Swiss-Prot record:
Its main location: cytoplasm. It comes from Bifidobacterium animalis subsp. lactis (strain AD011). ATP binds at H16, D177, G178, K179, D257, R263, K264, A280, K284. Coiled coil: none annotated. Keywords: ATP-binding, Cytoplasm, Magnesium, Metal-binding, Nucleotide-binding, One-carbon metabolism, Potassium, Transferase. The gene is metK. Binds 2 divalent ions per subunit. Mg(2+) binds at D18. This is S-adenosylmethionine synthase. It comes from the Bacteria. Disulfide bonds: none annotated.
Length: 408
């Protein structure tokens, strides 16, 4: 008898306390990049009942109205009344931002931004070291069209749809806080076979019954998403649905649980399908390799899979603070390489095609733009948005050519 292999992943809505904090931190980052693309930003946000605290280190030529950014973000998410636990107009906002340490800055910015046009690109790439040490991972798999693991892809789509039907009124009685989780059964060849369980926990008004909520979510959220994403490729005609398993979920957001930037790093990435170096993304400008190198590693992995060189890939890259060149690059293909191609050849092709120095990553992926607010909910990867440049498969042909020279 074949062993049943079940793999799960979760996502959260934009109204989850930790995700509120991520979105605030990235909204502040975007505002600073909009005024000064070379801003160095490391902003954290914490949340508790009726209160936000924004703190961290910033070096920027611009000025950001932090109070307004916090309130605008909270309002956009949907927290507009103390009745649901948080009011954007009356919540408290404390701000404690200081300048970036000059010792950190000296290893990152050896060329002043005003002089960048006076030096060659190669000089600039060599001059900008990594903003910190660390290990970053990127992953791609051909089990979905967007080359993401199916459990996290479905969980994100369900979370997004849950927020969508709340905002457009398609499902009444919903409030902003919510979580989703999907369990997929895989076959002996590690291909998705069927949906086993869909779990949704969502904040709601007190007058709705759990039975009515369950039926509405199944009709307007679960079934449309499964049909659209899966079609006939993965069975989804007999799965378990769990909605608010503990009962009512009336009080949510920071009124129920404290929130903090960077506490949903597995939700933000691959749902547990790949390793994680531990560094969060939100609130960090692209000089921080926690963010930019993780984006680049996804870009590398996705291009490898899109080129047909492997079915599943994890890319690891590591840096030393103040040093431009990665201290290591490793490509793991889990034995899924294309016929006639070795893992070592793929790794060598990656070194030939991709420049993973921090300044080169920033240039290649155009990361100095104010694009980060929309990354802060529903996943940083697997999104079909032109601003998510790390999702572009623009290196496929170069990889194929590089492999051809190595195989021959």
């Amino acid at each position: 008898m074949a062993e049943v292999k079940l793999i799960s992943a979760e996502s959260v809505t934009e109204g989850h306390p930790d995700k509120i904090c991520d979105q605030i931190s990235d909204a502040i980052l975007d505002d600073m990049l909009r005024q000064d693309p070379h801003s160095h930003v490391a902003v954290e946000t914490s949340a508790t009942k009726g209160q936000f605290w924004v703190f961290g280190e910033v070096t920027s030529k611009g000025y950001s109205d932090i109070q307004s950014i916090v309130r605008d973000t909270v309002r956009r998410i949907g927290y507009t009344s103390s009745v649901i636990g948080l009011d954007a107009d009356s919540c408290g906002v404390l701000v404690s931002l200081s300048e970036q340490s000059p010792e950190i800055n000296q290893g990152v910015s050896r060329i002043d931004s005003d002089r960048e046009n006076a030096v060659s690109r190669e000089e600039r790439y060599e001059a900008q070291g990594a903003g910190d040490q660390g290990v970053m991972f990127g992953y791609a798999s051909d089990e979905t069209d967007v080359l993401m693991p199916l459990p996290i892809h479905l969980a994100h789509r369900l979370a997004y749809r849950l927020a969508e039907v709340r905002k457009n009124g398609e499902v009444k009685f919903l409030r902003p806080d919510g979580k989703t989780q999907v369990t997929i059964e895989y076959d002996e060849e590690n291909r998705p076979l069927r949906v086993d369980t869909v779990l949704i926990s969502t904040q709601h008004d007190p007058e709705v019954s759990q039975e009515a909520l369950r039926e509405d979510l199944r009709e307007h959220v679960i079934e449309p998403v499964l049909d659209e994403v899966l079609g006939d490729a993965v069975k989804h005609d007999d799965y378990r649905v769990l909605v608010n398993p503990t009962g009512s979920f009336i009080m949510g957001g920071p009124a129920a649980d404290a929130g903090l930037t960077g506490r949903k790093i597995i939700v933000d990435t691959y749902g547990g399908a790949a390793h994680h170096g531990g560094g969060a993304f939100s609130g960090k400008d692209p000089s921080k390799v926690d963010r930019s190198a993780a984006y680049a590693a996804r870009w590398v992995a996705k291009n490898i899979v899109a080129a047909g060189l492997a079915h599943k890939v994890e890319v690891q890259v590591a840096y030393a603070i103040g040093v431009a060149e990665p201290v290591s690059i490793n490509v793991e293909t889990y034995g899924t390489e294309a016929d006639g191609v070795t893992r070592e050849q793929i790794q060598e092709a990656v070194r030939k095609v991709f420049d993973l120095r921090p300044a080169a990553i920033v240039d290649e992926l155009d990361l100095l733009r104010p694009i980060y607010s929309k990354t802060a909910a529903y996943g940083h990867f697997g999104r079909e948005d032109d601003d998510f440049t790390w999702e572009h498969t623009n290196k496929v042909d170069e990889l194929k050519r590089a492999i051809a020279t190595l195989v021959d």
